[in-house]
């Protein structure tokens, strides 16, 4: 009990300590945290029997959030693989207006579709990924096809070479984010996935944004040793629309800070199926992911991923069947990984991109700009996945 109290106390001290390094101190603390110890006692767990359990100073900030139940029909929710909005739980945080956290609202089995899409479909060309800078378009044309047999029969050993899917760190869809100029442009665009657009628009409508348009997405692929650096998503031209985040696979610690980095962040878990919305005041807050955590239920996948996707789906469903062969590949991947989809609207209604040419800027190769810290066996040592660090 003494060690636990001391650990919680140290987190509380860091969380309330102002100063230039307030965010970074907590980032380092949680990056080095040990699962199953008192290190994580101060992390808010919104999914803990829907009780928003936590013992740190952040737990006192948790409040219930109201959703717009009538804005999404049960039929449309079902088409996206979601429970009726009336059955969702939603939380906010005092001091963070516009922040909404929805613990796993997906129907049993329906997460399978979104995981498969991230690994099998969205990773294909013409979408853009981090491997494009190191390989030809032909080599990255179909990462799934090149990796599926390897993942299906892979052996758990640190010395084996990784498949291309395991080297994947980010994919962009819709308006493709330019990591060098930190801008979007009209001429760097491919059609946004219709199923992901539909899912995003239902969630946005339930949160009060019925006119939200899904125009750009950044998919992040985390290994257990990956991190996402402190940053703000500010490159979109319309900040009045929310940023949506969908998590699948292993859990992660998410840090939500303030407008400046000298404000200490609030720590929370993001589990498989959880959805997070940053809007209004919270749309431009600093945030980061310092730690991906192995499944606390033991080796393998979270329980919410055990139920299979129904073999027969409604004719108008945006969700497609997932074969057991495909899921075997997905499950093998997720045992040591997390996938996150972030969706945003880039332009306001009737808004166009600026006419001035977008100049390419030299890439900043400092550690600050790189977010994923991979292990020593990776051929792609570090991959930048956050827009505005």
Swiss-Prot record:
Sequence intervals crossing the membrane: none
Impact upon substituting residue 148 to A: Does not affect DNA lyase activity
Effect of residue 116 to A: Does not affect DNA lyase activity
Pfam family, any one: 2OG-FeII_Oxy_2
Keyword Nucleotide-binding among UniProt keywords: no
Domain Fe2OG dioxygenase: 208-347
Cofactor detail note: Binds 1 Fe(2+) ion per subunit.
Gene Ontology CC terms, in alphabetical order: cytoplasm; endoplasmic reticulum; euchromatin; mitochondrion; nucleoplasm; nucleus
Cofactor(s) of this protein: Fe(2+)
Known outcome of mutating residue 113 to A: Does not affect DNA lyase activity
Major location category of this protein: nucleus
Domain of life assignment: Eukaryota
Chain positions of site Primary catalytic residue forming the imine linkage with DNA: 133
Tissue: Ubiquitous.
Catalytic activity: 2'-deoxyribonucleotide-(2'-deoxyribose 5'-phosphate)-2'-deoxyribonucleotide-DNA = a 3'-end 2'-deoxyribonucleotide-(2,3-dehydro-2,3-deoxyribose 5'-phosphate)-DNA + a 5'-end 5'-phospho-2'-deoxyribonucleoside-DNA + H(+); a methylated nucleobase within DNA + 2-oxoglutarate + O2 = a nucleobase within DNA + formaldehyde + succinate + CO2; an N(6)-methyl-2'-deoxyadenosine in DNA + 2-oxoglutarate + O2 = a 2'-deoxyadenosine in DNA + formaldehyde + succinate + CO2; an N(1)-methyladenosine in tRNA + 2-oxoglutarate + O2 = an adenosine in tRNA + formaldehyde + succinate + CO2
Result when mutating residue 3 to A: Does not affect DNA lyase activity
EC number from the UniProt entry: 1.14.11.-, 1.14.11.51, 4.2.99.18, 1.14.11.33
Subunit structure, as described in the record: Monomer. Interacts with DNAJB6.
Protein name (record): Nucleic acid dioxygenase ALKBH1
């Amino acid at each position: 009990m003494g060690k636990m109290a001391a650990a919680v106390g140290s987190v509380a001290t860091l969380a309330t300590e102002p100063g230039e390094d307030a965010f970074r101190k907590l980032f380092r603390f949680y990056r080095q945290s040990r699962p199953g110890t008192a290190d994580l006692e101060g992390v808010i767990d919104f999914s803990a029997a829907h009780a928003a359990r936590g013992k740190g100073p952040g737990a006192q900030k948790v409040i219930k959030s109201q959703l717009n139940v009538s804005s999404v029909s049960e039929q449309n929710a079902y088409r996206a693989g979601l429970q009726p909005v009336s059955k969702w739980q939603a939380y906010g945080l005092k001091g963070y207006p516009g922040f909404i956290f929805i613990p796993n609202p997906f129907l049993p089995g329906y997460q399978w579709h979104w995981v498969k899409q991230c690994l099998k479909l969205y990773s294909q060309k013409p979408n853009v990924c981090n491997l494009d800078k190191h390989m030809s378009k032909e080599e990255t044309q179909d990462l799934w096809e090149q990796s599926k047999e390897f993942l299906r029969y892979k052996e758990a050993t640190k010395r084996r070479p990784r498949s291309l899917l395991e080297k994947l760190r980010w994919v962009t869809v819709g308006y493709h984010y330019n990591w060098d100029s930190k801008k979007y442009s009209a001429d760097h665009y491919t059609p946004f996935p219709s199923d992901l657009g539909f899912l995003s628009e239902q969630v946005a409508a339930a949160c009060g944004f019925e006119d939200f348009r899904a125009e750009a997405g950044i998919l992040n692929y985390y290994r257990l040793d990956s991190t996402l650096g402190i940053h703000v998503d500010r490159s979109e031209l319309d900040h009045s629309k929310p940023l949506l985040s969908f998590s699948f696979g292993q859990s992660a610690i998410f840090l939500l800070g303030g407008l400046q980095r000298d404000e200490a962040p609030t720590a929370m878990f993001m589990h498989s199926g959880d959805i997070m919305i940053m809007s209004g005041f919270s749309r431009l807050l600093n945030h980061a992911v310092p730690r991906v955590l192995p499944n606390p239920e033991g080796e393998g996948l979270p329980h919410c991923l055990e139920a299979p996707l129904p073999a027969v789906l409604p004719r108008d469903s945006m969700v497609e069947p997932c074969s057991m062969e495909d899921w075997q590949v997905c499950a093998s991947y997720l045992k040591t990984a997390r996938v996150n989809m972030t969706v945003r609207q880039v332009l306001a209604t009737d808004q166009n991109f600026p006419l001035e040419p977008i100049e390419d800027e030299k890439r900043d190769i400092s550690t600050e700009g790189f977010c994923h810290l991979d292990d020593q066996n990776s051929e792609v040592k570090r991959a930048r996945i956050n827009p505005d660090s």
